[in-house]
Amino acid sequence: MVATCLQVVGFVTSFVGWIGIIVTTSTNDWVVTCSYTIPTCRKMDELGSKGLWADCVMATGLHHCKPLVDILILPGYAQACRALMIAASVLGLPGILLLLTVLPCIRMGHEPGVAKYRRAQLAGVLLILLALCAIVATIWFPVCAHREITIVSFGYSLYAGWIGAVMCLVGGCVIVCCSGDAQSFGENRFYYSSGSSSPTHAKSAHV
């Protein structure tokens, strides 16, 4: 029962974290830039934000972004962070799908518990790799960007990335280390049997 709960917790945590990674990858509010104080920059229309895909200027009621499409002049750290975040987003899809198939409520024929166990371990490893890619990118980008521009604060995209990466890391570690062994995956399967008096639910143990 404990292993089953940990599997569900690992799946939910990882799924929410993966959504956060996708939000971070697709948005541009990574760092807020300003050469003066924020109120002064707002008055002078010089408050901006920088992300993987665009540089934006935020004025009162306006939000103008300039896409970063010229790869030749794009800094190396920005290209590397793009690659890391795209890899993290892509790795999350097979990881979540594999994790979905090993949940106790999902049954794929009469497969042995060891098959579910191996898929769970693979899903956990993918989620951990996803988290490491996101952590490196979300730390590397603001550090390198600070050398080029004046950063006054972090944007919501960066916070979403940090939270998502930590959740995926925790979820992956729970799946790999704490969700039981191959035997527990075989035992956590339920079938429906109707008796002569009333319907009952029974657990089937597979060796």
From Swiss-Prot:
PROSITE patterns the record matches: CLAUDIN
Family of the protein in this entry: Belongs to the claudin family.
Subunit details: Interacts with tetraspanin-3/TSPAN3. Interacts with OCLN.
Protein name stated in the entry: Claudin-11
Gene: Cldn11
Keywords assigned by UniProt, alphabetized: Cell junction, Cell membrane, Membrane, Phosphoprotein, Tight junction, Transmembrane, Transmembrane helix
Spans through the membrane: 2-22, 83-103, 123-143, 158-178
Stretches in topological domain Cytoplasmic: 1, 104-122, 179-207
Molecular-function GO terms, alphabetical: identical protein binding; structural molecule activity
Gene3D superfamilies xrefs: 1.20.140.150
